[in-house]
């Protein structure tokens, strides 16, 4: 797949060939869904917790004798049916993480990249750099390229001025190539790759 390389000012600066093994697959929604679910499950804190009847600060003495009062049979006031009693089957501290094989994760990344390529939502830039860490300057460059919701993936190191300038834009994410992931690719409208990022992806899936 041949794609035009542009500068940050929107000027053409050659072309690059994207591998069909990475960018030319037919996207499968089921694989993408599995990977996004796996990512989001690992983000959940799992620190929710309530106290059971054995943990609350209340006496464990029987409320009244078993027989002879005419009332229903009850044990301690810490039982779940009483106000202030312990929670029955409440949430406990646990991990929400699920497992996903490495090969499926790698395949999902290829399908995410392919889905953007198929929708013509990939832009390749020769490099992404700014003279000053100014959000206004970055927005002007995005206006020339017609970008709003965008994920920028650079090489091994993200240019510091770009990272600082993009930090104040709510729909712009900047990642080094080792941080590229399915969820962040899909949640933004446009994927911007530098030539260094394309080379790194080609080497990664060689």
UniProtKB/Swiss-Prot annotation:
Task: Please list the GO biological process terms of this entry.
Answer: translation
User: Its Gene Ontology molecular function terms?
Assistant: rRNA binding; structural constituent of ribosome
Q: Which Pfam families match?
A: Ribosomal_L4
Identify the Gene3D superfamilies for this entry: 3.40.1370.10
Can the keyword Ribonucleoprotein be found in this entry's annotation? Answer: yes
**One GO location term (cellular component):** ribonucleoprotein complex
Q: Does the keyword RNA-binding apply?
A: yes
- Record's keyword terms, sorted: Ribonucleoprotein, Ribosomal protein, RNA-binding, rRNA-binding
Assembly and binders: Part of the 50S ribosomal subunit.
- Protein function: One of the primary rRNA binding proteins, this protein initially binds near the 5'-end of the 23S rRNA. It is important during the early stages of 50S assembly. It makes multiple contacts with different domains of the 23S rRNA in the assembled 50S subunit and ribosome.
Which NCBIfam families has this protein been placed in?
A: rplD_bact
Give the family per the record: Belongs to the universal ribosomal protein uL4 family.
Q: Quote the protein name from its UniProt record.
A: Large ribosomal subunit protein uL4
Species source reads: Xanthobacter autotrophicus (strain ATCC BAA-1158 / Py2)
Q: Corresponding gene?
A: rplD
């Amino acid at each position: 797949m041949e794609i035009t390389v542009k500068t940050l000012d929107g000027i053409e600066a050659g072309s690059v060939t994207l591998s069909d093994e990475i960018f030319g697959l037919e996207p499968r929604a089921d694989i993408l869904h599995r990977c996004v679910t796996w990512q989001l499950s690992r983000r959940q804190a799992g620190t929710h917790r309530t106290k059971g009847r054995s943990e609350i600060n209340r006496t464990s003495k029987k409320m009244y004798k078993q027989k002879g009062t005419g009332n229903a049979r009850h044990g301690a006031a810490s039982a779940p049916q009483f106000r202030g009693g312990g929670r029955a089957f409440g949430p406990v501290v646990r991990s929400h993480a699920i497992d996903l094989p490495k090969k499926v994760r790698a395949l999902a990344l290829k399908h995410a990249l392919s889905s953007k390529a198929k929708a013509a939502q990939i832009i390749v830039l020769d490099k992404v750099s700014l003279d000053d860490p100014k959000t206004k300057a970055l927005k002007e460059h995005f206006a020339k390229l017609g970008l709003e919701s965008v994920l920028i993936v650079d090489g091994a190191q993200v240019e510091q001025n770009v990272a600082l300038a993009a930090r104040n834009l709510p729909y712009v994410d900047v990642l080094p190539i080792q941080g590229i992931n399915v969820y962040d690719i899909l949640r933004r409208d446009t994927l911007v790759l530098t030539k260094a990022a394309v080379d790194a992806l080609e080497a990664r899936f060689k």
